[in-house]
Amino acid sequence: MRPCRLQLRHCPTLSKGSIDMHIKTVLFATAAAFAAASTPVFAADAIVAAEPEPVEYVRVCDAYGTGYFYIPGTETCLKVSGYLRFEVYGGPDEKGTSDWNARTRAHVQFTAKSDTEYGPLTGLIVIRNNGDNASTNSILDSAYIDIAGFRAGLFYSWWDDDLSGEPDVLSSFETLHNSVRYQYENGDFYAGISVDELEDGYFKDGENPNNVGVALGVGGKAGVVSYQLIGGYDTDNEEGAVRGMIFADIGPGTLGLAGVYASGPNSYYSQSEWTVAAEYAIKATDKWTITPMAQYFGNYVPDLDTFHGNSFDGLGDAWKVGITVDYQIVDNLYAKATVDYTDPDDADEVTKGFFRLQRAF
């Protein structure tokens, strides 16, 4: 075949319809080529999914016991614990002129620990809310820093320790102080000294509760016996108190003995000049514990709310008996009931008690 020229009249072998078809084919091919060439440009504007960030899951920290976990991104271990408690109290004028009162408490504790060259660094915060009918109050129950035996902040003193039952009175009713303390520990033995702000403590007539106290304590465990001996001196009242406690596992339970002597009314002890107490916590079953107790007071103060005397002279004695029953319903759910009877020489006899339901976590 002869080569075809560009002019149509010199291509007699191609009809006009065939030429039109060839032109359309060329145009479609050109458009397709441009579309293919422009595809990368449009692809650059497309939305591309970002790579997912790595997730750091919470890790268990077992260096300080159960319940701790690492705060993400740190080497600090944190534990959250606490309890919910419902109580009903009964007794003469328990609340105002009423002989009974119900209340609910929420108690949450945050404990942070980390390793240092001086040993574990501990920080503790306890928030407590007490609900009584429609009124509630939240308080900072404890908050302190502890490292290498040194502790500073708001915390309960050694005087807050007592027998396992409920009715005994072996300390003042204010054992929570802003304090600085050093406690040496070696195995089952400890000894320490504490300087306490006794702002809410006992004060005499004509004075204000604004004083400082110094407390000493030693304690430990030897076999089936544990013990504690503490003393406190109230610098403003210029009086002091000493207390000893001992516990021994005997038979199906634990025997507890305690004694207190106070030189005069002070912020560490002001209920009486001296007292002795005994209890026996009987482990009846895995779930039941029954604890009877008895206590005798020499030179007993019947009403601490109104007493601001300079000494215990002239006061009568008193004796007290009581019983506490503890029952574990299920894991972390407990019930407690207690009742006690007090017979003072200088006041009316008193019978009171309470029932408690508590869920720990």
What label would you give each PLM region?
Residues 41, 327-329, 349-361:
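Outer-membrane beta-barrel "beta-signal"
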